[in-house]
Amino acid sequence: MKNFMDEKFMLSTKVAEDLYNDFAKDMPIIDYHCHISPQEICENKSFKNITEVWLYGDHYKWRLMRSSGVDEKYITGDSSDYEKFLAYVKAIETAIGNPLYHWSHLELQRYFGVYEVISEKNAPVIWEKANKVLNDGLTVREIIKKSNVKAICTTDDPIDSLEYHLKLKEDTSFNVKVLPAFRPDKALGINKDGYTDWVSKLAKVSKKNINSYDMFLEALNDRIEFFHSVGGRVSDHALDYVPYLEASKEEVNTIFAKALKGEKVSFEEETKFRTFTMKFLGKKYASLGWAMELHMNAKRDNNTRMYNKLGPDTGFDSVNDNGVAGPLSRFLDSLEKEGSLPKTIIYSLNPNDNFVIGTLLGCFQGTEAFGKIQFGAAWWFNDHRDGMVEQMETLANLGAFSTFIGMLTDSRSFLSYTRHEYFRRILCDLIGKWVENGEVPNDMELLGRITKNICFNNANNYFEMGL
């Protein structure tokens, strides 16, 4: 029997141990997609207690607590921080098999030196030890440095001032790149509440009178240029469905004018608007050498009552099953045939799409980057051992495994960098099993190089970080 979460955790062969310890463990981190706050990095936020850094804003943990029968007052309500901490400890104690069980232990081990098993019995000791470390100076920047993070790409609205990115760019005391990522979901949300208000804000920040679709595109173009000047090299799109329906610019201009008047547009009109706008954005990204991330098949805000109470991103999303093969293929092809397909990273929350993505990759590759079209890392509800292995095995079966740009946190928590360790252990174990089974040669120079590339080097080159 193996020890619980020791140095051999998830490493089932000697090759896996050697790959992890000699090649993966000490590689730096590029967290190229996350939702952490650049303001909190800039201001070097400190935390009063473990609850603030461990549970605040972490809807993964909130969701588990609800699934364990915890009352909402101990999750997002007005209970004390210790009561919330204890409620989570009780929930996670019985959540064996859930990746949160491993992540939570890794977070306590790596940042607080707490190796006690998370349990109600150990809760007072964990609370005391973790809080002492926080009080001794474990700030946001210290967490980032301790994690060996070299670059972070946040998720930012086109109208964002990027004030804190600019300040961090000039801050010579902090040697980590904090770069914006362009997230134009609100620009595409023509049927969403508050759309005209958002367009007004875009007009203000871009200093343009947006009274036509052409002016709207000009404003988006200017914001992309601004993001680029601050160091942005990646965009991100959360697609509740993959839009593809051709339309002329005149037709889209009419649709946009209709929306500006506050009129409801049909689903067909929305799809035409999104298709045309996405193609415009894709061409712009390609011209600047950006990468475009496409996150598909999330069904968001399923619980109306809780959405009205807490808002989005609070733990009430699920996997969707919209068909992606047809529209995704047509969208990529529409850009490729004009020579304007940017580097693209494709994620689906639905693992049934894995072979769709895995086979589409090979249809649109190019020489602009090593692995120009990427099968994105296992995402969100797939962010566990089985999901990661399935994603990597699919990529290996259908494409070029060694071109993979590896892991990201996609997180709102600064403690989530341990997910990179989790991924690296699983990566090394997978390769180790291939060696054990005689499926790949026991060539540590080759395997070590592939491992280091997937952990860091591929992403460094793909995003042109220069690290």
UniProtKB/Swiss-Prot annotation:
Keyword Cell inner membrane set for record: no
Highest taxon listed in the record's lineage: Bacteria
Pfam families to which the protein is assigned, alphabetical: UxaC
Pathway: Carbohydrate metabolism; pentose and glucuronate interconversion
Broadest EC class assigned to this enzyme: isomerase
Protein keywords: Isomerase
One GO-annotated biological process of the protein: D-galacturonate catabolic process
Listed EC numbers: 5.3.1.12
InterPro entries per record: Metal_Hydrolase, Uronate_isomerase
UniProt catalytic activity: D-glucuronate = D-fructuronate; aldehydo-D-galacturonate = keto-D-tagaturonate
GO molecular function, one term: glucuronate isomerase activity
Gene3D superfamilies recorded: Metal-dependent hydrolases, uronate isomerase, domain 2, chain A
Cystine crosslinks: none
Family: Belongs to the metallo-dependent hydrolases superfamily. Uronate isomerase family.
HAMAP family in alphabetical order: UxaC (MF_00675)
Protein name: Uronate isomerase
Organism: Clostridium acetobutylicum (strain ATCC 824 / DSM 792 / JCM 1419 / IAM 19013 / LMG 5710 / NBRC 13948 / NRRL B-527 / VKM B-1787 / 2291 / W)
